[in-house]
Design a protein with these regions (language model features):
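Bacterial N-terminal signal peptides
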Residues: 9-19
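Sec-exported extracytoplasmic/periplasmic mature domains
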Residues: 114, 132-140, 434, 443-453
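Alpha/propeptide regions of enzymes that mature by internal proteolysis
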Residues: 38-40, 425-447
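Boundary at the C-terminal end of the N-terminal hydrophobic targeting segment
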Residues: 21-23
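Hydrophobic alpha-helical segments
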Residues: 350, 403, 410, 448-484
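Substrate-recognition/specificity elements adjacent to catalytic centers across diverse enzyme folds
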Residues: 25-292, 297-300, 304, 316, ...
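Bacterial N-terminal signal peptides that target proteins for export
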Residues: 1-10
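Compact, glycine/acidic-enriched structural inserts
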Residues: 318-389, 432
Length: 484
């Protein structure tokens, strides 16, 4: 089948206005890929108000607009999602890329994208095409690329749908707590752990399987690959290609020491003292009779910001709010019918499995008394200013193998609920964006798997509501609080 791309004028980033007074600044851009003209108005807060006549054009324009505003952020996101950060930062990012590829979603993409919306394939594909349209436009004049590209001596690369559905950015689970609890049981015993740590439910199974070797559990960096790909990216002076723009090593160390000290201070705090908040009040209790909603989801401060505001107007869509710029739709916001917000609802969506491996073949693990072959994928990581690195990605029936203790013939794998279909954080907000009632909002929330969330709702009919959403494994014979 041959698809003919029509060319239309799109009024992009035009009609800048402030305090409802329109200026005369208008820019017209002609793009391949639009069905009809699209108009984007930039207000004095920098929010893009996108008006399109088709759904395809709406999300094409959202991708184009967000990439134009946050191009460097988009490139770093793409590199994180695809496991290609080492091409930018060199050898120190190899383990990050290894971990990213190990936890890459490798399931059915059509089913995956349509989980988030009945027309998810079309929406996500349109968004990606819009992102790439701006990248192509920017590459026509590389000298005009934002300064960070010049400092790092890189250029933006095209996106694919796999970048949008990446899991790398989400608040995913509690595998570190599970491992630390298992180590504590090894070190001081179950009874002492129960005495020192609060559990809910209050009496979980903490008995370790006899197969688990406490020396191995205590003395190995089992989650190194997992943690490597989850860490935020931090640049160093020698990442800067132009030496005259580098910080001195002394200045860099001063900044790094401050960040390290802040992280240590944060780690001293109880996890119960850290978190987001939201609340919603019935109109019966407000002065004007309308429901009142407050939502304050806490995330790490970063530059550029994790949040990005948009207003999307098209057939079946009229929604404004915030989200992550690299994701189509609006994660937190309101339409003509209601408003919604979210905070994290703690669910245990990860389990650490320990296997006996075959001393004669480390790629075999024992399951139900039989040796099973791990699935092995070989990949090559390209590295800036160094030779490429070949890695083996291993998988058991339960998930990615994160550590192999060949001396003790053991392998550790993580079973993450978020690697199943529907595990991309916040993308299911696409369904919420079109909800017209509390009932429709609850139905849409059923598709929001990761992270677990407290969803709140308030609508023009005066309804308010709270719904916990998320998925967690059904554990029939273990608690998930310690490795199994």
């Amino acid at each position: 089948m041959v698809t003919f791309l029509k060319r239309f004028n799109a009024l992009l980033f035009g009609l800048l206005f402030s305090n409802c007074v329109f200026s005369q600044e208008t820019t017209q851009v002609t793009l391949d890929g639009l069905d009809k003209p699209v108009e984007i108005l930039k207000d004095h807060w920098g929010i893009s108000h996108i008006y399109a006549e088709t759904e395809h054009d709406l999300f094409f324009a959202q991708g184009y607009s967000a990439a134009r505003d946050r191009l460097f952020q988009f490139e770093i996101w793409r590199a994180q999602a695809t496991g290609t950060v080492a091409e930018i930062l060199g050898s120190r990012a190899v383990d990050r890329d290894h971990g990213t590829r190990l936890f890459k979603f490798r399931g059915p993409m059509h089913e995956e994208m349509n989980h988030y919306h009945p027309r998810g394939v079309d929406i996500i594909t349109s968004f990606v095409h819009g992102v790439n349209a701006y990248i192509d436009e920017a590459l026509q004049d590389p000298d005009s690329l934002p300064l960070p590209f010049k400092l790092l001596d890189i250029q933006p690369k095209h996106w694919t749908e796999e970048v949008v559905i990446s899991r790398h950015q989400g608040l995913l689970g509690n595998i570190s707590l599970e491992l630390s609890t298992g180590r504590a049981v090894c070190a001081i015993g179950e009874d002492k752990v129960r005495e020192l740590r609060y559990f809910h439910p209050h009496d979980p199974i903490l008995t370790l399987d006899p197969l688990i070797d406490c020396d191995s559990l205590l003395n190995n960096d089992i989650l190194h690959l997992y943690n490597s790909y989850r860490r935020p990216i931090r640049f160093q002076p020698d990442d800067i290609a132009l030496a005259q723009y580098r910080n001195t090593e002394e200045a860099y160390e001063t900044i790094a020491d401050i960040l390290i000290e802040e992280e240590r201070d944060l780690q001293k705090r109880s996890i119960d003292d850290i978190g987001s908040n939201n609340w919603v009040v019935s109109g019966d209790l407000t002065q004007d009779g309308w429901p009142m909603m407050i939502n304050d989801p806490h995330r790490s401060q970063a530059v550029p910001s994790l949040r990005y505001w948009s207003h999307l107007v098209g057939p079946g869509w009229n929604v404004i709010g915030g989200g992550e710029p690299e994701i189509p739709g609006i994660s937190i916001g309101h339409n003509e019918h209601g408003a919604w917000g979210l905070t994290v609802f703690n669910t245990d969506g990860e389990d650490l499995y320990v296997y006996e491996t075959n001393p004669n073949n480390p790629s075999q693990y024992r399951y139900l008394g039989e040796w099973e072959e791990m699935r092995v994928i070989s990949e090559t990581i390209e590295v800036k200013d160094a030779r490429s690195v070949s890695v083996e990605l291993k998988y058991t029936r339960h998930g990615p193998v994160v550590f192999e203790d060949q001396e003790n013939s053991l392998a550790y794998a993580i079973r993450p609920a978020w690697m199943e279909v529907g595990g991309s954080p916040y993308l299911a907000s696409l369904r919420m964006d079109q909800a017209t009632s509390w009932e429709e909002f609850r139905e849409a929330s059923n598709f929001s798997n990761i992270p677990g969330e407290n969803m709140i709702w308030a609508d023009r009919q005066g309804n308010i509501g709270w719904q916990a959403v998320g998925i967690a494994p059904i554990r029939r014979n273990f608690s998930g609080m310690v490795p199994v």
